[in-house]
UniProtKB/Swiss-Prot annotation:
Gene encoding the protein: rpmJ
Magnesium in keyword set: no
Entry superkingdom: Bacteria
Protein name, entry field: Large ribosomal subunit protein bL36
UniProt keyword annotation of Ribosomal protein present: yes
PROSITE patterns given in the database record: RIBOSOMAL_L36
Length: 41
């Protein structure tokens, strides 16, 4: 999982990316292609 400051550009890299908020953190999750996972930090 990558740690990035801005997730907007990462979300547009793949059409199945989902923006999810969990426990005060923002994640990009992708079930079909997990290498696109990222966390804002």
């Amino acid at each position: 999982m990558k740690i990035k400051n801005s997730l907007k550009a990462l979300r547009e890299r793949h059409r199945n990316n989902r923006l999810v908020r969990r426990k005060g953190r923002v994640y990009i999750l992708n079930k079909t292609n997990p290498r696109f996972r990222a966390r804002q930090g």
